């Protein structure tokens, strides 16, 4: 499989895209291109007003970023509180379901014991409950 790709350069990226990360030989041709486009870096002479305006812009941007970070921190803290509250609610809901399950099992056991003691068969009790259910359904629909 390696012989299939050995002959061509089709799998390699073009040089414009690889220049983003620098050339493979270790030279810094990207910096040369930038410095030649802007002129020599030692010849750049910024005036005090230009430096002051750049500094003020930097301070404004840092302040804005600081405010955004504070807002994100506040939001993340509120999200954490909401998640903790939701977890507590879910735990309480699980406990409620467990308690309800225990009560239903106990009620069903008591009903089965009552049916056994009364001498009436299970089929008869099921017919009675079915008739009561049909009666409730009929009243609910009309």
UniProtKB/Swiss-Prot annotation:
List this protein's GO terms for biological process.
Answer: endoplasmic reticulum to Golgi vesicle-mediated transport; intracellular protein transport; retrograde vesicle-mediated transport, Golgi to endoplasmic reticulum; vesicle fusion; vesicle fusion with Golgi apparatus
Task: List all membrane-crossing ranges.
Answer: 118-141
Principal subcellular localization: Golgi
According to the UniProt entry, which residue ranges have a biased composition of type Polar residues?
26-36
Q: By its UniProt entry, which CDD domains does this protein fall under?
A: SNARE_Bet1 (cd15853)
Kindly report every residue range on the membrane side named Cytoplasmic: 1-117
Regions of this protein lying in the Vesicular compartment? 142
Location of region: Disordered: 1-36
Provide the Gene Ontology terms for cellular component. Answer: COPII-coated ER to Golgi transport vesicle; endoplasmic reticulum membrane; Golgi membrane; membrane; SNARE complex
List, for all copies, the residue spans of the domain called t-SNARE coiled-coil homology: 52-114
Q: Name one GO molecular function term.
A: SNAP receptor activity
Q: How does it sit in the membrane?
A: Single-pass type IV membrane protein
The alphabetical list of record keywords is:
Coiled coil, Endoplasmic reticulum, ER-Golgi transport, Golgi apparatus, Membrane, Protein transport, Transmembrane, Transmembrane helix, Transport
| InterPro entries reported for this sequence | BET1_SNARE, T_SNARE_dom
The subcellular location is:
Golgi apparatus membrane; Endoplasmic reticulum membrane
So what does this one do?
A: SNARE required for targeting and fusion of ER-derived transport vesicles with the Golgi complex.
Assembly, in brief, is: Component of a SNARE complex consisting of SED5, BOS1, BET1 and SEC22 or YKT6. Interacts with SEC24.
Query: What family is this protein classified in?
Result: Belongs to the BET1 family.
Name used for this protein in its record: Protein transport protein BET1
Gene encoding this chain?
BET1
């Amino acid at each position: 499989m390696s012989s299939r790709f050995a002959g061509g350069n089709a799998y390699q990226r073009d040089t414009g895209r690889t220049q983003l990360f620098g050339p493979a030989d270790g030279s810094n041709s990207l910096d040369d291109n930038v410095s030649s486009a802007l002129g020599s870096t030692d010849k750049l002479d910024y005036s005090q007003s230009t430096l002051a305006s750049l500094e003020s812009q930097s301070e404004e941007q840092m302040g804005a970023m600081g405010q955004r970070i504070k807002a994100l921190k506040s939001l993340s803290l509120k999200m954490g509180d909401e998640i903790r509250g939701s977890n507590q609610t879910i735990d309480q809901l699980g406990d409620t379901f467990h308690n309800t399950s225990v009560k239903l099992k106990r009620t069903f056991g008591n009903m089965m014991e009552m049916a056994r003691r009364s001498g009436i068969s299970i089929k008869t009790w099921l017919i009675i409950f079915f008739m009561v259910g049909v009666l409730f359904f009929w009243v609910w629909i009309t």
